[in-house]
């Protein structure tokens, strides 16, 4: 079963889905538009949404939370003093896609990103011997990234399953190729410069992550994504907004993987010069893994918070066919994760 089919066959075709009530506005979209959070508030919000327990929330609990958010007119923000409302918003934002109102597959929810990515990034940055040991971590890393980017991206446009599958395959192949280049260069030429050996994998990991986002979400800039007014009403589909959404996500991934890969390399460089390392050389891998997990643990919510989930764009920047039916000066679009 493909990832797209898995997403569609989730048991949670949730209350208030867009095809059920024409005037319905997705609660998650309403939240991100009305909150207009600062970077600090977005960061704190993401630290809650990235709680690993959000991966295991039951469908029944999510449906009950959605029912509360969809039927209670007084529910407007998780800042409410009511603990039930706070928990309902957390469950909804962490598990439901804003464009389709479908449940996000458990393995590709934002809360699952760090547990999967941290050890995989560590393995992909570790010098290994043998072609299989070099390629397999990169394939897994790039395949998971492509699936995560696609599932959590904007899904407001129509797309054939074959079209999306081909793009996913291209994203995995191209980013994997970029990711393995440093390892093959090292195996063939035996680079000796300490900083070249450390920085080359970081540079190519950044390139691979950027390529992955661009390829897996390129349909957003080709077909266009839905743009909305401040009430959440869809005004049309814009390629310009789609391109902006992809660029913002690409920039956030570069920050995430570049920083998360660079920090462990810097720490290990200085650690290898200490007396403790000379006595305990095996501790290097423990330190590097710990640094990778800690760096990604900080950088995942940081990178997800750089840009708002619901971005803004001036109406005069959009296509003429969208400008004409509205007098709004600020238009909104779902950027995706």
Curated annotation (Swiss-Prot):
Keywords: Acetylation, Amino-acid transport, Membrane, Mitochondrion, Mitochondrion inner membrane, Primary mitochondrial disease, Transmembrane, Transmembrane helix, Transport. The keyword Zinc-finger does not apply. The modification N-acetylserine is found at residue 2. One of its GO terms (biological process) is amino acid transport. It is a multi-pass membrane protein. It is found in: Mitochondrion inner membrane. The modification N6-acetyllysine is found at residue 197. The chain crosses the membrane at residues 111-131, 133-153, 165-185, 251-271, 293-313. One of its GO terms (cellular component) is mitochondrion. Its main location: mitochondrion. GO terms for molecular function: monoatomic ion transmembrane transporter activity; transmembrane transporter activity. It is linked to Combined oxidative phosphorylation deficiency 18: An autosomal recessive disorder of mitochondrial dysfunction characterized by intrauterine growth retardation, hypotonia, visual impairment, speech delay, and lactic acidosis associated with decreased mitochondrial respiratory chain activity. Affected patients may also show hematologic abnormalities, mainly macrocytic anemia. Belongs to the sideroflexin family. Mitochondrial amino-acid transporter. Does not act as a serine transporter: not able to mediate transport of serine into mitochondria. This is Sideroflexin-4.
């Amino acid at each position: 079963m493909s990832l797209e089919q898995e997403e569609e066959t989730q048991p949670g075709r949730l209350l208030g889905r867009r095809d059920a009530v024409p005037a319905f506005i997705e609660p998650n979209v309403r939240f991100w538009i009305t909150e207009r959070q600062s970077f600090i508030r977005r960061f704190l919000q993401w630290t809650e949404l990235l709680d690993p327990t959000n991966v295991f929330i039951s469908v029944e609990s999510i449906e009950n939370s959605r029912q509360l958010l969809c039927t209670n007119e007084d529910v407007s923000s998780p800042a409410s003093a009511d603990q039930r409302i706070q928990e309902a918003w957390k469950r909804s934002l962490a598990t439901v896609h804003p464009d389709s109102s479908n449940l996000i597959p458990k393995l590709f929810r934002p809360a699952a990103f760090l547990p999967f990515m941290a050890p995989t990034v560590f393995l992909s940055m570790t010098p290994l011997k043998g072609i299989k040991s070099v390629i397999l971590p990169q394939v897994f890393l790039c395949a998971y990234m492509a699936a995560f980017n696609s599932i959590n991206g904007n899904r407001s446009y129509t797309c054939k399953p074959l079209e999306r599958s081909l793009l996913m395959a291209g994203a995995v192949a191209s980013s994997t190729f970029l990711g393995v280049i440093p390892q093959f260069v090292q195996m063939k030429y035996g680079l000796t410069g300490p900083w070249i050996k450390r920085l080359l994998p970081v540079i190519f990991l950044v390139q691979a992550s950027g390529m992955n986002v661009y390829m897996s979400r390129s349909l957003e800039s080709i077909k266009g994504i839905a743009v909305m007014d401040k009430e959440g009403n869809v005004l049309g589909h814009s390629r310009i907004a789609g391109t902006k959404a992809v660029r913002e996500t690409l920039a956030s991934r570069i920050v995430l993987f570049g920083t998360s890969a660079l920090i462990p390399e810097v720490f290990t460089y200085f650690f290898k010069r200490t007396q403790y390392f000379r006595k305990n050389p095996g501790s290097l891998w423990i330190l590097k893994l710990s640094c990778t997990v800690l760096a990604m643990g900080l950088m995942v919510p940081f990178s997800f918070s750089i840009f708002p989930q619901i971005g803004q764009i001036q109406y005069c920047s959009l296509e003429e066919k969208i400008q004409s039916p509205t007098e709004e000066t600020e238009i909104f679009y779902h950027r995706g994760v």
